[in-house]
Amino acid sequence: MSSARGLVLVRMGRGHHFGALLAVPAAGRTWDLAVSHYDGSDLPDGAIVEWHQRCLGGKWDGIWQFFSAYPEALAAYDFYWLVDDDIEADPATVNALFDYVRTHGFELAQPALTTDSYYSHRITLACPGFRHRHTNLVEIMVPILARDTLHRVLPIIQQTRSGFGLDWLWQRFVTHPCKQIAIIDALPVRHARPLRQTLRPAIEAQGTTPEEERARLVCAHGLSRLHGVAIAGVTDSGRTIQGRLRMALALAITYWRQRKQIDKRPWGVEQTGLLMYRQLFAPLGFSKNGK
């Protein structure tokens, strides 16, 4: 373990897209790297890691097992990037991500996704013109958690393999959610594989499905479906845009201009209208009553 204040923890297997981050000398990064294998694959030759583990199964049960095996890691870092192995990023971007969340005091954040990424939530796609947007949603594939937030979330992580439903819940554990949750547009990464194809079979082999796990979280914590909403944003010029209506207009215009670059799922009039509707009316989910 080094003096780095950030930890990148990746659940990794065959066919990963993580090679650019595996052989970075410690002197070239401000973070430590932990690799937790979810299958029988091995570290490639030349990999430089501070932590290594093998735990067959899903993403989040592996993360729980990692911190159970290495409890000292829970106190060693200020921020934790719990990232999927099909995320493509370069070392400079990861260095900058940790610097960005530290500088802005975020407790829960994620990098935006490039427009050629496979994506679940439209709001997670990079929005040109913004440095970052304050949102109610950080998805489970690329979250960055502050240490205290991770400690609050860990008991919930113990209950899930897939993580389905975590992104409907963990914003409740942030101290000031309107200010400390963000999608960072200035530092996008690429999600390279189609959604939900890699770990689902391993989870189903253990007698459950991601949807069943989410249903249990919904029941246990009084959750409802959460749609991503941007409540404020900081532009490239440093100007702050406040309010759901103003952000709805800014996002609709910007994403419309980018629609031809969003090539994994179509973006047209219907998607733009749905984005604006949710921006204006969807509950934020910061508390049990949905606010």
Where do the model's predicted regions map?
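Conserved catalytic core of nucleotide-sugar-dependent glycosyltransferases
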Residues: 90-176
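Short beta-strand-to-loop acidic/aromatic patch adjacent to the donor-nucleotide binding site
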Residues: 75-88
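Short, well-formed alpha-helical segments that are part of the catalytic scaffolds
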Residues: 1, 5-28, 41-43
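Short, hinge-like loop/turn segments at secondary-structure boundaries
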Residues: 51-53, 125-129, 199-202
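Active-site-proximal specificity loops/subdomain of glycosyltransferases
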Residues: 21, 29-78
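C-terminal catalytic/acceptor-binding lobe
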Residues: 160, 164, 168-291
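Short glycine/serine/threonine-enriched helix-capping/active-site loop
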Residues: 36, 109-114, 184-185, 191-192
